[in-house]
Amino acid sequence: MNRIGIIGGGASGIVAAIAAARSDGDAQVFILEQKENIGKKILATGNGRCNLTNEAMDASCYHGEDPEFARNVLKQFGYGETLEFFASLGLFTKSRGGYIYPRSDQAASVLELLEMELRRQKVKIYTGVRVEALKLSAKGFVIRADGQRFPADRVILACGGKASKSLGSDGSGYALARSMGHTLSPVVPALVQLKVKKHPFAKAAGVRTDAKVAALLGRQVLAEDTGEMQITAYGISGIPVFQISRHIAKGLYEGKEMKVRVDFLPEMEASQVRKAFNTHLDKCPYATCQEFLTGIFPKKLIPRLLELSHIRQNFPASELKPAQWEDLIRACKQTLLTIEDTNGFDNAQVCAGGVRTGEVYPDTLESRYADGLYLTGELLDVEGICGGYNLQWAWATGYLAGRAAAERP
């Protein structure tokens, strides 16, 4: 009998167990999960709605040392395969702007269907057990957890990374992978908020506004994204900030000075802003600078933009000199923020970095160093952007690894 041990009961581990059990009905499949319940992170995804995947599924939406690795995995288990898999569980889905959610809009529905299938497939689940070591023996593997020994012919490492420790990912999987001979690219927080040094917008905390943000290393733009940015007391947040955060985190890890350029009027070029301001001034010749900006920006943001421009709030807009107008336009379009840190692993949605993908076969997720060992999900040096891409990665790698583990001769 093929004994398949899965370390980690998150998204990729659960799907790996189902795929393994479906592929080999005689296999003895079991999951070891250190939290009291499996699938805790699934419940937190998509603000509790579980953004399963995305219609615009492309390898360019993933980052890592080897971009081709993600492409090869997704060719085998992509958007269509994910929908088919969840349909086989009985899940109805819907699209919201290309983002795929359960029709119920509840992540709990997704987890419950996965748990129902685990029971149907007679997968044994051990919760509240922390894996301490993984050893190779003459007869396969031995997993040590809380003083117990779990022998296995195949092992799937689905432990997750270090992001959101409260949901079960504490980085312990990296040590297990290392013990099997694997190496890691630097692991840093990704899809995370950024902390700003000498934060000029701290008093505007709570403001949400459309903006384009760009990650800068010197004059080089590493990445940029547009959307709703949130100003916090310590820095900046929101989806566009999350999308560029991995580049900032990598730079900070390497000891580089990292900046973010913020454009508060992304829908207009600077020349268009200049023209719009002139037209606006013709209509409001008696407005103070505070009043002039009232119809353009959120109230709490206006004093901060004027402060950056060295302009008094009650100064008549009609009396501003050309150089002052340019300072104001620069503040609106090209504010530079120096980033001192990310908001850490505990607040990150995922990690950038992990087990180097060159050490894993992309068609099976099997280790090149240890026969019968498979690595999935966030443990690998692949992470996606916001929008269902990281769950897609978990489903895909979990399914391929589970199937391969069951079918391996």
UniProtKB/Swiss-Prot annotation:
The UniProt record lists the keyword Flavoprotein: yes
MF-aspect GO terms: oxidoreductase activity
GO biological process, one term: lipid catabolic process
Amino-acid positions noted as binding FAD in the UniProt annotation, renumbered to this chain: S12, E33, V131, E378, N390, L391
Keyword Oxidoreductase: yes
Catalytic activity: 3-oxocholan-24-oyl-CoA + NAD(+) = 3-oxochol-4-en-24-oyl-CoA + NADH + H(+); 3-oxochol-4-en-24-oyl-CoA + NAD(+) = 3-oxochol-4,6-dien-24-oyl-CoA + NADH + H(+); 12alpha-hydroxy-3-oxocholan-24-oyl-CoA + NAD(+) = 12alpha-hydroxy-3-oxochol-4-en-24-oyl-CoA + NADH + H(+); 12alpha-hydroxy-3-oxochol-4-en-24-oyl-CoA + NAD(+) = 12alpha-hydroxy-3-oxochola-4,6-dien-24-oyl-CoA + NADH + H(+)
Keywords annotated in UniProt: Bile acid catabolism, FAD, Flavoprotein, Lipid degradation, Lipid metabolism, NAD, Oxidoreductase, Steroid metabolism
Pathway annotation: Lipid metabolism; bile acid degradation
This enzyme's EC code(s): 1.3.1.114
Enzyme class per UniProt: oxidoreductase
Requisite cofactors: FAD
Annotated function: Involved in the secondary bile acid metabolism. Catalyzes two subsequent reductions of the double bonds within the bile acid A/B rings of 3-oxochol-4,6-dien-24-oyl-CoA and 12alpha-hydroxy-3-oxochol-4,6-dien-24-oyl-CoA to yield 3-oxocholan-24-oyl-CoA and 12alpha-hydroxy-3-oxocholan-24-oyl-CoA, respectively.
Family note: Belongs to the BaiN/RdsA family. BaiN subfamily.
Protein name: 3-dehydro-bile acid delta(4,6)-reductase
Organism per entry: Clostridium scindens (strain ATCC 35704 / DSM 5676 / VPI 13733 / 19)
